[in-house]
From Swiss-Prot:
Alphabetized PANTHER family for the sequence: 39S RIBOSOMAL PROTEIN L35, MITOCHONDRIAL (PTHR15909), LARGE RIBOSOMAL SUBUNIT PROTEIN BL35M (PTHR15909:SF0)
Gene Ontology CC: one annotated term: mitochondrion
Transmembrane segment boundaries: none
Lineage: Eukaryota, Metazoa, Ecdysozoa, Nematoda, Chromadorea
InterPro entries membership: Ribosomal_bL35m (IPR019338)
Entry keywords, A to Z: Mitochondrion, Ribonucleoprotein, Ribosomal protein, Transit peptide
Key word Mitochondrion present: yes
Tree of life domain: Eukaryota
Name listed for the protein in its UniProt record: Large ribosomal subunit protein bL35m
Family of the protein in this entry: Belongs to the bacterial ribosomal protein bL35 family.
Protein localization: Mitochondrion
Length: 158
């Protein structure tokens, strides 16, 4: 049994409620770091934050906008203002993590009319093959049975 003094000290030690910051780029909730599973449908759900912040190209690479591109633009120099509007590519490890957070629907190539990213869907001047996270070879275009010198002479990606 607690006495009146002990009870009053317990009540007095109550603290003010914690104020939570508004959700921004740095404030990603903990449930977005792992793969979520939908019990009603019986399969995993795509992370909505990934869909909002990143774009998956048809060749498997992920791009995202430059962080802080709209913050205090008037204070930055001209070069920063120009380059901050560019998109950045993710690293191989980041691409693998983002692929695991997505469902197969979002991993399929998408073809939209008047797509501003259509120029970036094909990788140019890359001789190494694209390999997925299991080490399997992923083709970007149909297989053509001819040697590399002939294909470089007569076929271009543009």
């Amino acid at each position: 049994m607690l006495g009146k003094t002990a009870l009053s000290t317990l009540c007095a030690s109550r603290q003010a409620p914690i104020t939570l910051a508004a959700r921004g780029i740095a404030n990603i909730p903990a449930h977005e770091y792992h793969i979520r599973f939908d019990q009603k449908v019986g399969r995993k759900r795509p992370a909505q934050d990934v869909l909002d912040r990143f774009k998956r190209l048809n060749n498997g690479m992920w791009i995202h906008a430059h962080p802080g591109r709209h913050k205090l633009r008037y204070m930055k120099d001209e070069t920063w203002q120009k380059t901050s509007l560019y998109y950045e590519t993710c690293t191989k490890e980041q691409c693998e993590i983002l692929d695991k957070l997505m469902t197969p629907y979002w991993l399929r190539p998408k073809h939209y009319p008047n797509d501003p990213y259509s120029a970036y869907n094909v990788r140019h001047n890359v001789t190494s093959p694209r390999v997925d996270d299991r080490g399997n070879f992923v083709r970007e275009r149909k297989k053509v049975l001819m040697d590399d010198s002939t294909s470089k002479r007569f076929f271009k990606d543009c």
